[in-house]
Amino acid sequence: MLEANFADSNPLMDAWAAYNLKDYLTITVGQKQTFTNNREMIMHEKNLSMADRSIVSQYFSGTGRELGLFFESKLYLGKIALKPSIAITTGDGRNSFGSSSIDVDMGGLKYGGRLDVLPLGEFKSGNDGVGADFAREESPRLLVGGAMSYNDGASNKVGEGHGDFVLYDKEGDSKFPALRKIAADLLFKWQGWSIMAEYVNASATDLKGIYTKSTGDQPLQPEEIANYLNLGNGYNVQVGYLLKSGWGFDARFSKVKPEFKETETSPLW
């Protein structure tokens, strides 16, 4: 699959190839929407119920795309469907290697996974990847999921870019904090009704031995990490109803609580 947005300075959005191993495993290589973020960020932009993403998605993520290797599986326990997934990516988001030979990848890899449980059976084809209940599920359908990721060296506020800031070790070489994200979410649909609820937490680790100056005389203070990474907690709840005529009504409530108070140089400004 190949998809681009030429209104963007970095137009490449999706470029990947997948191999299906029977019915229970799909292996994908390339750049695509990762499943290690919150539920709304898994959905493609054109499949959202509202014009933009919630402030939770905007604060903790960028486009949600990663370059790497993705493993997606599907298992059944009677009527219950289990969907475990694992991803190993560059940790620099889309267009990971920049626009030139000197715009190189920074930091380490990103490791993530997700487990979705569908206790009432599967949604109709594709209906769990859109905001509204376009398929008008005849029976109630519920998805409960959890995801986590570990970005081993982030140099972008949400871990989807590189070189936006540089921190150092004692010797003056570049050294970046690790960014850890956890998400829990659910999606419910039935006869035109849709409910999505999600929680996200982002935290930084490996801060010891990091300095803000290459001279190695200004150690990074714990609260100063808010100047570089979007950390904290957030939750989002969205309820909608889709009429048979195609008209829909949606309401959303979102809140983000940063881990530390923002400063004039924090990513929020």
Model-derived segments and spans:
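Outer membrane beta-barrel
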Residues: 1-94, 102-122, 140-143, 148-150, ...
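Outer-membrane beta-barrel pore domains
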Residues: 19, 48, 138-269
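Short, P/G- and charge-enriched loop/turn segments at secondary-structure junctions
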Residues: 55-58, 132, 171-173
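Short amphipathic alpha-helical surface micro-motifs
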Residues: 66-67, 123-130, 176-178
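Short intrinsically disordered coil segments
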Residues: 86, 129-135, 161-164
